[in-house]
Amino acid sequence: MKDDFAEEEEVHSFGYKRFGIQEGTQCTKCKNNWALKLSIILLYILCALLTITVAILGYKVVEKMDNVTGGMETSRQTYDDKLTAVESDLKKLGDQTGKKALSTNSELSTFRSDILDLRQQLREITEKTSKNKDTLEKLQASGDALVDRQSQLKETLENNSFLITTVNKTLQAYNGYVTNLQQDTSVLQGNLQSQMYSHNVVIMNLNNLNLTQVQQRNLITNLQRSVDDTSQAIQRIKNDFQNLQQVFLQAKKDTDWLKEKVQSLQTLAANNSALAKANNDTLEDMNSQLSSFTGQMDNITTASQANEQNLKDLQDVHRDAENRTAAKFSQLEERFQLFESDIVNIISNISYTAHYLRTLTSNLNEVRTTCTDTLTKHTDDLTSLNNTLANIRLDSVSLRMQQDLMRSRLDTEVANLSVIMEEMKLVDSKHGQLIKNFTILQGPPGPRGPKGDRGQQGPPGPTGNKGQKGEKGEPGPPGPAGERGPIGPVGPPGERGSKGSKGLQGSKGSRGSPGKPGPQGPSGDPGPPGPPGKDGLPGPQGPPGFQGLQGTVGEPGVPGPRGLPGLPGMPGMPGIKGPPGPPGPSGAAVPLALKTEPTTAPEDNGCLPYWKNFTDKCYYFSTERDFFEDAKLFCERMSSHLVFINTGEEQQWIKNQMVAKQNYWIGLTDLEQENEWRWLDGTLLEYKNWKAGQPDNWGHGHGPGEDCAGLINFGQWNDFPCEDMNHFICEKDRERELAITL
């Protein structure tokens, strides 16, 4: 019984334990023995009834439990399915939310980083805008200064134009003066020529007079000699006459003792008388000749005195003319010196104004280039800022749309979860009502479940404390050269310059007040004799003069016909060595093949001096500045042309050869057609190295534009107005074999 009861008890307990239901309390046995049997019988009966009832109840309970377990299993399955679906949905939602959260977190982090970058950019933009404001203020100040400078330049240009007009007027006046001076000089030259002609005539007359004086002196000397001879002859005649008188006296004395000889002496006396008469005649002739000679001498002396007076007058006139011409020449030289000094001052002023204008144009070009660079940079920065702001706006709009979608999805998911939670609450309440009568035992812990998915990345932790200052690193490589900064403030006034050139001569002042009369000075030296007066009236005709002297010997007559050749004479002694003769005629011409001219020795690279070689070309880098057309003409005169750059190697070599901070013309222009750049030989560009934003044809109504190209710093190309002054580079082919000039 006990065993059966225990088995039943075990079965019931097993069945109850199976469903987690605890057993009920057992019946107490009667202690009385008499009642034991009854109780045992009743117990058997009750046990049988109980077994039957328990079996029936168990069956019913089992059926109900089966139904309940089936319903619970179905409900559990449904709930499991729902829970799995909910879990899958939650997982999906979790994955989606995780992905979306990750994406949103990444997007938010990117958005935050973008916002931080935008804030940083906005800060930089604000700083740049503040700097740009400062720079704009500086630019405005510089623009105002430029406007003031331009107004000053306009004023200076107007003053310079006025000065140039005045200079032109003065130059025209000086041209008039110069023409007048040229006319005066031509007149003076004519006068000088006439004076020279008259001077030559006077010199000829003087030479003739000198010749006549020499001839007269020779005649006078001859006359004096003849007079001396005549005087000697007269003395001789006188001596002879005295001797004759003495002889006559002796003859008278001796007449007594000569009477005897009278007859013999009569003939002698007749002869002597004839001789005496002849002597008397000769003496009378000599006296007449002497008187004629004295008259001629008087005439000659008067003529010589007149000639001397005329010579003195001519010398005085010549001296006066020379003094006048010297005074005029000194005045003209002084005037020319004044004109030269004025012209030098004018030329210096013009050169200074031209240099000042060139410096102004170069400064304006530099300011223009810097302004264009800054404006292009500002425009690029503004365009980039506008693009970034537009991108930020688009990103913010897309993020807002994504946030709205996420909010709507979250709202729908939360609503679904709230509905599912309400259903779960209802199911839990039903389960609670069903399992109120059962005591649920806590079972043993189940097996360990599979490893879950990796959780989401947590939010970043708080920023840590600032670390210690690290060691000083090594100095980095030097950075690239920064942009050119703004123009600094005006410096202090410089030192006083050197003394300028002498100014123009001032205008003549007003006439001063007359001074007090001074004391009477001493009498001066007598002046030079005045010029001779006019010729007087012709005097009365004088008596006929004496017979003139014998004239000079005439020129030799025409030689007669040549006679027959005589016999050859004996050879004479060798004569004295004569002086060296004149140089003989030039010899025969040297053949052209042997005649060479020295040429400038070229360098070993095949280029002339001051030319540089690269590959098969020669290049000339100018040291002076010139206009584009003048530079082109200069290169053409040197049998070359402005440089054509067709390769990068050539560009790099030219860049290395350039002098810093100097611009150079190249043979590139768009004068024929705008914005179609061609080399001077008409070919199109094969290689380009324009600066960023160039060519821009920067004119803006201020001129014809920029139609000529050149090299600036770092060898980049830029367009310039053709009227600018720049250095230039000439190019020509290298001469491999220099022919010898024959």
UniProtKB/Swiss-Prot annotation:
SMART domains: CLECT. Residues 439-591 are annotated as: Disordered. Keywords: Calcium, Coiled coil, Collagen, Disulfide bond, Glycoprotein, Lectin, Membrane, Metal-binding, Receptor, Repeat, Signal-anchor, Transmembrane, Transmembrane helix. Ca(2+) 3 binds at Q694, D696, E706, N718, D719. It is a single-pass type II membrane protein. A carbohydrate binds at K691, Q694, D696, E706, N718, D719. It holds the Pfam family Lectin_C. Ca(2+) 1 binds at F644, N646, E650, E731. GO terms for cellular component: collagen trimer; collagen-containing extracellular matrix; extracellular space; membrane. Residues 59-742 are extracellular. Glycans are attached at N67, N159, N168, N271. Residues 501-514, 534-556 have a biased composition (Low complexity). Residues 443-502, 527-586 form the Collagen-like domain. This is Collectin-12. It comes from Bos taurus (Bovine). Its main location: membrane. Ca(2+) 2 binds at D670, E674, N697, E706, D707. It comes from the Eukaryota. GO terms for biological process: phagocytosis, recognition. The lineage of its organism: Eukaryota, Metazoa, Chordata, Craniata, Vertebrata.
